[in-house]
Amino acid sequence: MRVEGPYLNPKRAGEQFAGKLKNPDKEEYTSLLESTDCIKRWDASPELPGALEFARYLKSKGVLVAVSHTESEYEGIKAAFEAGFTHTAHFYNGMPGFHKCREYKYEGTVESVYLTDGMTIELIADGIHLPATILRLAYKLKGVEKTCLVTDALAYAAADGMEITDPNVIIEDGVCKMADHSSLAGSIATMDILVRTMVKAGIPLADAVRMASETPARIMGVDDRKGALQKDMDADVLILDRELNIRAAWAMGRLVEDTNTLF
């Protein structure tokens, strides 16, 4: 299970989190992690009071801690990385880049993450959240070993005809937006779309596939059973045609219903 929030900076979290955010609560997160081992990743804003202690505790429990919805600059990202924030969620989204304040210029979270060599990133490569130039830049600077793809998809992804029950969001132009058009609210893309988008952006197919399989499995610490086709690993297999459309899928060795167009 991945947890995003509620320990997020309200200035960067977006309207969908309004009224639900707070600083890290030690009693809350320790009791939660002591009662279950299903949480494998937790996203938070490292600049919040208590966030570094939070990261150190999660790291001791083997939980991946990710930078998310943040305004941290270089020194903050450096301290966060040392405390246990080793990954950055939906890179470029919910965080500032290079910016100017009055007559002075400052690096943003984006540049700070690039300068933190050991930190990994994820890209919402749906063709809407990030342009092709940024996808190529991230690939060039972080490389296939430290870059993975993420759909960041809402429940409406791949759900044909699903009724939208949240009045604050709309589906428009192939993406989920806030109803007032103030910002994007999430993706409705599936992973095959992300791979196609990366290839269209000029990324080699082999690397695009690795960023959708092997790299995220390693970042999440499940590469002993996921992310590759090897003996004794989970038999998760996806067959694509030349246009990278799904022709068939197997999960744990079983053909997924309604995916087979091969036979």
Language-model segments: what does each one mean?
Residues M1-C38:
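Divalent-metal coordination cores built from histidine and acidic residues
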Residues K22-K26, S45-L48, L52, E103-E107, ...:
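Electropositive phosphate-/nucleotide-binding environments in soluble metabolic enzymes
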Residues K105-L123, Y139-T151, Y156-L240:
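His/Asp/Glu-enriched, well-ordered alpha-helical/loop segment
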